[in-house]
UniProtKB/Swiss-Prot annotation:
Cellular-component GO terms for this entry: cytosol
Annotated gene: pyrH
Function per UniProt: Catalyzes the reversible phosphorylation of UMP to UDP.
Transmembrane spans: none
Official protein name in the record: Uridylate kinase
Species annotation: Coxiella burnetii (strain RSA 493 / Nine Mile phase I)
HAMAP family from the UniProt entry: PyrH_B (MF_01220_B)
Domain of life: Bacteria
GO molecular function, one term: ATP binding
BP GO terms, sorted: 'de novo' CTP biosynthetic process; UDP biosynthetic process
Keyword entries, A-Z: ATP-binding, Cytoplasm, Kinase, Nucleotide-binding, Pyrimidine biosynthesis, Transferase
Major location (coarse): cytoplasm
Record's catalysed reaction(s): UMP + ATP = UDP + ADP
Stated family: Belongs to the UMP kinase family.
Length: 243
């Protein structure tokens, strides 16, 4: 029998924004942030937890912003998908330097750069002890990487989708604007919808609700938060079917 606390989850889908890789710098990717991410993921990996990651591309491009600048929205979304692949390559490099076995599976195949996404292949890699990074969203325009996270989480039978943000969880209001905003520790899907709380993209959120996929929202910038959310029910905000 294994002594000591055990992880709450066996297989997780971690959703990270592209902006998380910027840190506080002016560059799209901060190498120090990559090193910290690799350290955090290694801590969880060493517990025997299977880890899959969906990474955004907002540190390079956002389709909506490019549309406002005059670029066709569909074209802008494809540019954003390629940005997620650049981020995936950066993460893979950092993980490999930390001796983590890792594979990139892309919804847009790119021979010599990343393998094409295949559900069975993804599950096989996880079962073989490899970290899997999903790139290029769902491969479809007009679909957010939040939706890619909910979809991939359901496809790989993850125990939970971990939504990494820059705040400690889901609040009653924007904590940056309202210091009196309340941090929720536990919400049902219906409560979050009724209160119009910004948990994630609405389509992605409803998909998680419909397929009973729990969500944990937490602060990726908080030291040790990823490990804590795996081990501790109190870290971040849990959103599920409720009682």
């Amino acid at each position: 029998m294994t002594n000591g606390p055990q992880p709450l989850y066996r297989r997780v889908l971690l959703k990270m924004s592209g902006e998380a890789l910027m840190g506080k710098g002016l560059h799209a990717i901060d190498p120090n942030v990559l090193d910290r991410m690799a350290k955090d993921v290694t801590q969880v990996y060493q517990l025997g937890v299977q880890i899959a990651i969906v990474i955004g591309g907002g540190n390079f491009f956002r389709g909506a912003a490019l549309q406002a600048a005059g670029i066709n929205r569909i074209t802008g979304d494809y540019m954003g998908m390629l940005a997620t692949l650049m981020n995936a390559l950066a993460l893979r490099d950092a993980f490999e330097r930390s001796n983590l076995p890792v594979r990139i599976l892309s919804a847009i195949p790119m021979t010599g750069v990343a393998d094409a996404f295949h559900r069975r292949k993804a599950i096989h890699h996880l079962q073989q002890g490899r970290v899997v990074i999903f790139a290029a969203g769902t491969g479809n325009p007009l679909v957010t990487t939040d939706s890619a996270a909910s979809l991939r989480g359901i496809e790989i039978n993850a125990d939970v989708v971990l939504k990494a943000t820059n705040v400690d969880g889901v609040y009653s209001d924007d904590p940056a604007k309202n210091p009196q905003a309340k941090l929720y520790k536990h919400l049902s899907y219906q409560e979050a919808l009724k209160k119009e709380l910004a948990v994630m993209d609405l389509a992605a959120f409803c998909q998680c609700r419909d397929y009973n996929m729990p969500l944990r929202v937490f602060n990726i910038n908080k030291p040790g938060a990823l490990l804590s959310v795996i081990m501790n029910q109190e870290e971040g905000t849990l959103v599920d079917q409720g009682q």
